[in-house]
């Protein structure tokens, strides 16, 4: 009753391949959308935190994740997409994702920017298959523009993370453990 011929297999494989090709993001407006959001996020950050202009000028590269959405209720997770800029040019696109379990509740959205202050830190990030944010990052969380000043811009840390634009409330939120993976939008 289950007579599966080579012709049926070939037709099924061709249909699956055709269907898979329909979802290919190459040639879509995904990259342009991410770049526009990155530009908007950088302009908002520079306006709200003028001290980050000096930080950006000294950085070897900047990873901008314009919108990260975090949700947690016992188990939690976050996701966002952004671009790595070296100078004024976008060189790669990345997804940031994390998962967690434990005492947490709520949802929030925020923007974050990673400043790679040394060539080694940028090179390690770009070479890795999936880079995880850890203890070697200096975090600058701020809701007031006057608090993000000299202590951040004179830091000797190889990577500085600026987190801003938080909306919502989530207990137990952090960037630590976030994994960054290169994508093709």
PLM regions: where:
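Small-residue-enriched, tightly packed secondary-structure blocks
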Residues: 23-185
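N-terminal secretory signal peptides and thylakoid transit peptides that target proteins
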Residues: 1-21
